[in-house]
């Protein structure tokens, strides 16, 4: 059993920071110390921003993006092409594609990918919402921008099958996205090239 080195409030801060992806216990301790040292410049404003986000952030009922409005800013932007829909696994993938700035379209966030080994099936993802959006008839192309993993490929094939009865072109990102790679880690140039070289399934 390890000794406590600080009061319960600091220990709780460290424990919560350690649950953030990419931060382990050691990094969480360093981050906590940095925040405490910069209390007025960082810790207090960060606490306020987190409280405000907890109160105001919503999941878009149309596409699954996170925003402070529902529908989100992307879904209500009339300058975007309503006939083209990019399907992504997570919001981080949507943000990565937006950073690439190649296409001015709308999105659909699945909320994950099919993974039978992890017990994640079609009903656990926002696939039904995607089918409903395509069934409306306004969408002419669905671009599957899922990760190039085994689970991502499985998800792409399942979605293609679900959309096969609709008059919609289904494409996917070109294989410039490395197998096993995740969109959030790719640079803007790679993402832009992959979007331009997409192929029909």
From Swiss-Prot:
Stretches assigned to the Toprim domain: 83-178
Classification via InterPro entries: DNA_Rcmb_RecR (IPR000093), Rcmb_RecR (IPR023627), Rcmb_RecR_Znf (IPR015967), TOPRIM_dom (IPR006171), TOPRIM_RecR (IPR034137)
One Pfam family per UniProt: Toprim_4
GO annotation terms (biological process): DNA recombination; DNA repair
SMART domains from the UniProt entry: TOPRIM
Classification via SUPFAM superfamilies: Recombination protein RecR
Residue intervals of every C4-type zinc finger in the record: 60-75
GO molecular function: DNA binding; zinc ion binding
Family: Belongs to the RecR family.
HAMAP family listed in its UniProt record: RecR (MF_00017)
Protein name: Recombination protein RecR
Record lineage: Bacteria, Pseudomonadati, Pseudomonadota, Alphaproteobacteria, Hyphomicrobiales
